[in-house]
Amino acid sequence: MLQVNVELKHHHYPIKIGQGLLTNPQSYAPLKAGDNVMIVSNPTIAQYYLATVRDTLITIGCKVDTVLLADGEQYKTFESLNQIFTALLENDHHRDTTLVALGGGVIGDVTGYAAASYQRGVRFIQIPTTLLAQIDSSIGGKTAINHPLGKNMIGAFYQPAAVIIDTQVLNTLAKRQVSAGLAEVIKYGVAFDSHFFEWLEQHIDQLMQLDPETLAHCIQRCCQLKAAIVAQDETEQGERALLNFGHTFGHSIEAHLGYGTWLHGESVAVGMLEAAELSKILGNLTEDQLARLEKLLANAVLPTTSPDGMTADQYLPYMWRDKKVLNGQLRLVLLKSFGQAYITTEATEQQILTAIQRFTQH
């Protein structure tokens, strides 16, 4: 078992990475005999892993209840949040309860926000079951639900007590979801670690085939990078915003199409290309670097052009609604070079449109 520790000012917790962790009672520390637990999952994940997790927790001596939410980004809503609160109240859960998020990013985000809010805060543990959740959304305490007018607009920073990453759960993950997770993996390389980007270029085929050792190394490196950034900037006042490379463009695609039409990682893939093209326009990246990024995304079976029918000017209203807008200025995460992300307000609207147009289908 590999472990990465997240060390924050007022909180620290382990990320445990390995095979067969769901059946190992030691993985679930700090849970112990007598603890009350509410597992939050969805029917897709529950059919594979709910019984395993529940039985292991019962073996530890926990009292376990479960609640299943509808599956998909379009259910990251007040209604799903309220469903968790209702289950907690109906089953008489108090402040000493622990929520366990068993699922992908949607389950993790909604469960985390429920944990932050229920009786002003209860403990929760992340068991991410998608690659994207394992390397990104389960780490760092960002919890949220969507609003019809914007993604992740209602939420809280609330850290888990532990993150349990069992790489075996990826064997039941749809190939499209594996690719979507690899978009965020590639983001870590291109934005923070050029050596890791080169390693990804060499190992993308093994990752697509879910080779266990390659996966474990990849997940560990992503977790190390994320943990280091979160430790510097827990509530996204500065450095942490760099993790949003490609996301301002990508969120525009998601919001325009309707959440859940394209997967988050698919939207981010195109968003990274558009941000990289803008970086090139501003005199930073080379055409060769842009081509390498495009090739790596294509090898991960990710889209490399905007959705059919979406024009460049349709991005702008969503981009202006982005949480990184400050004092009426659009703050974009761009690249000085591979591994060197930075934030700028210098790009003009015309430059942004030109960058997007390169990756729109005419």
UniProtKB/Swiss-Prot annotation:
<feature type="binding site">
    <location>
        <position position="151"/>
    </location>
    <ligand>
        <name>NAD(+)</name>
    </ligand>
</feature>
<comment type="pathway">
    <text>Metabolic intermediate biosynthesis; chorismate biosynthesis; chorismate from D-erythrose 4-phosphate and phosphoenolpyruvate: step 2/7.</text>
</comment>
<keyword id="KW-0170">Cobalt</keyword>
<feature type="binding site">
    <location>
        <begin position="105"/>
        <end position="109"/>
    </location>
    <ligand>
        <name>NAD(+)</name>
    </ligand>
</feature>
<keyword id="KW-0479">Metal-binding</keyword>
<dbReference type="InterPro" id="IPR030960">
    <property type="entry name" value="DHQS/DOIS_N"/>
</dbReference>
<feature type="binding site">
    <location>
        <position position="142"/>
    </location>
    <ligand>
        <name>NAD(+)</name>
    </ligand>
</feature>
<protein>
    <recommendedName>
        <fullName>3-dehydroquinate synthase</fullName>
        <ecNumber>4.2.3.4</ecNumber>
    </recommendedName>
</protein>
<keyword id="KW-0520">NAD</keyword>
<dbReference type="InterPro" id="IPR050071">
    <property type="entry name" value="Dehydroquinate_synthase"/>
</dbReference>
<dbReference type="GO" id="GO:0009073">
    <property type="term" value="P:aromatic amino acid family biosynthetic process"/>
</dbReference>
<dbReference type="GO" id="GO:0046872">
    <property type="term" value="F:metal ion binding"/>
</dbReference>
<feature type="binding site">
    <location>
        <position position="264"/>
    </location>
    <ligand>
        <name>Zn(2+)</name>
    </ligand>
</feature>
<feature type="binding site">
    <location>
        <position position="247"/>
    </location>
    <ligand>
        <name>Zn(2+)</name>
    </ligand>
</feature>
<dbReference type="Pfam" id="PF24621">
    <property type="entry name" value="DHQS_C"/>
</dbReference>
<keyword id="KW-0456">Lyase</keyword>
<comment type="similarity">
    <text>Belongs to the sugar phosphate cyclases superfamily. Dehydroquinate synthase family.</text>
</comment>
<keyword id="KW-0963">Cytoplasm</keyword>
<feature type="binding site">
    <location>
        <begin position="129"/>
        <end position="130"/>
    </location>
    <ligand>
        <name>NAD(+)</name>
    </ligand>
</feature>
<comment type="function">
    <text>Catalyzes the conversion of 3-deoxy-D-arabino-heptulosonate 7-phosphate (DAHP) to dehydroquinate (DHQ).</text>
</comment>
<feature type="binding site">
    <location>
        <position position="184"/>
    </location>
    <ligand>
        <name>Zn(2+)</name>
    </ligand>
</feature>
<dbReference type="GO" id="GO:0008652">
    <property type="term" value="P:amino acid biosynthetic process"/>
</dbReference>
<dbReference type="GO" id="GO:0003856">
    <property type="term" value="F:3-dehydroquinate synthase activity"/>
</dbReference>
<keyword id="KW-0547">Nucleotide-binding</keyword>
<dbReference type="GO" id="GO:0000166">
    <property type="term" value="F:nucleotide binding"/>
</dbReference>
<feature type="binding site">
    <location>
        <begin position="71"/>
        <end position="76"/>
    </location>
    <ligand>
        <name>NAD(+)</name>
    </ligand>
</feature>
<keyword id="KW-0028">Amino-acid biosynthesis</keyword>
<dbReference type="InterPro" id="IPR016037">
    <property type="entry name" value="DHQ_synth_AroB"/>
</dbReference>
<dbReference type="InterPro" id="IPR056179">
    <property type="entry name" value="DHQS_C"/>
</dbReference>
<dbReference type="InterPro" id="IPR030963">
    <property type="entry name" value="DHQ_synth_fam"/>
</dbReference>
<keyword id="KW-0862">Zinc</keyword>
<dbReference type="GO" id="GO:0009423">
    <property type="term" value="P:chorismate biosynthetic process"/>
</dbReference>
<dbReference type="Pfam" id="PF01761">
    <property type="entry name" value="DHQ_synthase"/>
</dbReference>
<keyword id="KW-0057">Aromatic amino acid biosynthesis</keyword>
<dbReference type="GO" id="GO:0005737">
    <property type="term" value="C:cytoplasm"/>
</dbReference>
